[in-house]
Curated annotation (Swiss-Prot):
Class in the EC hierarchy, top level: ligase
GO biological process, one term: glutamine metabolic process
Record gene name: carA
Family: Belongs to the CarA family.
Active site per UniProt: C248 (nucleophile), H333, E335
Name assigned to this protein: Carbamoyl phosphate synthase small chain
Pfam families on file: CPSase_sm_chain, GATase
NCBIfam families per the UniProt record, alphabetical: CPSaseIIsmall (TIGR01368), PRK12838.1 (NF009475)
């Protein structure tokens, strides 16, 4: 017989289901993800640090978990919520079940609940604090705890690498500032021949410039960009000296460094089916996204940044470029794994930018 578990929200509502994953019951910000596949990549995405993910697709875990598709070594989310968790997955690459991996990494979950109802609540009221309990009589106490608890402010500190390391390539050298990077960013750069040095988020502009890279990339990561104050002088110190590409949190920090401001979204963008329009080409890409903050478009008017991409669902800023310097960014994930791959060309654009900049520097110094 399956053990009961309850998902409790800070507004006092609760949902009865059954135990999935660990008994290490946690609290966190509850969000929803609309992707139909890629649950392994989702639960191992560091951008979900401290959050509880509600999967809107009704069946999760049906192709198991394998060792190759993780986006980080250790998942850092605080829980998952599913309608149905497959107990008997089937795939030739499968090595563990979803339940096994959640238990291994001390991540609790709940299955057998109405995920549509939970998603509607989040859409109507915004993201909420939530937690798990296995005892119905503890629900009232948990509600009080959720209403009072302060969630961590700087999740980047949890997931950023503590020491630099290198993923070897043969051509251009890239410094990747790790705010909670997904492994597929490194893969996409390596595939294009880039030698990637991953550095902590506290690395200074002087330390980066001393490495003499051909380009700098700011990774994705969790939480509020305004908390990551140390990144602002770093970005300002490298801008114009070497080509620059920011993704997700890196995009937001790029904008903040130039005088723009950010805001917390009601329920964010999380999924693999978000349409984004490229304003320069008119093309629409289907993108993978995972962010709860966005850049205020009006705050860009007094900056040297130009909007290059917009979300078609709500009109929020999805891409920027500097008007005169070799620097650009996108709010979404061009490295999306398992997909979509509509925006992979942005890595090619970055490589071309580095190559052209290097050639110009060579002519200037000749």
């Amino acid at each position: 017989m399956q053990s009961k578990r309850y998902l409790v929200l800070e507004d006092g509502s609760f949902y009865e289901g059954y135990r999935l994953g660990s008994d290490n019951l946690t609290v966190g910000e509850i969000v929803f993800n609309t992707a139909m596949t890629g649950y392994q990549e989702t639960i191992s995405d560091p951008s979900y640090t401290g959050q509880i993910i509600t999967f809107t697709y009704p069946l999760i875990g049906n192709y198991g978990i394998n060792r190759d598709d993780f986006e980080s070594l250790v998942p850092t989310l605080n829980g998952i919520v599913v309608k149905e968790a497959s107990a008997h997955p089937s795939n030739f690459r499968q090595q563990k079940t979803l339940h096994d991996v959640l238990e291994l990494h001390q991540i609790p979950g709940i299955a057998g609940v109405d995920t549509r109802s939970i998603t509607r609540k989040i859409r109507q009221h915004g993201v909420l604090k939530a937690g798990f309990t296995d005892r119905k009589e503890d629900i009232d106490q948990l509600v009080k705890h959720l209403q009072q608890v302060e969630l961590p402010k700087n999740e980047v500190e949890i997931v950023s690498t503590k020491t630099p390391y290198v993923s070897t390539g043969k051509d251009l050298s890239v410094v990747l500032v790790d705010f909670g990077k997904k492994q597929n960013i490194v893969r996409e750069l390596n595939v294009r021949g880039c030698n990637v040095t991953v550095v902590p988020y506290t690395t200074t502009a002087e330390e980066i410039l001393a490495m003499a890279p051909d380009g700098v990339m700011l990774s994705n990561g969790p939480g509020n960009p305004e908390v990551v104050e140390c990144a602002i002088p770093m970005i300002q110190g490298i801008l114009g000296k070497i080509p620059f590409f920011g993704i997700c949190l890196g995009h937001q920090l790029f904008a903040l460094s130039q005088g723009a401001s950010s805001f917390k979204m009601k329920f964010g963008h999380r999924g693999a089916n978000h349409p984004v329009k490229n304003l320069e080409t008119g093309k629409v890409d289907i993108t993978s996204q995972n962010h709860g903050y966005a850049i205020d478009i009006d705050s860009l008017k007094s900056t040297d940044l130009e909007v290059t991409h917009l979300a078609l669902n709500d009109g929020t800023v999805e891409g920027l470029k500097h008007k005169t310097l070799p620097a650009f960014s996108v709010q979404y994930h061009p490295e999306a794994n398992p997909g979509p791959s509509d925006s992979n060309y942005l890595f090619d654009d970055f490589v071309a930018m580095m190559t052209n900049f290097k050639e110009k520097e060579r002519h200037i110094n000749a």
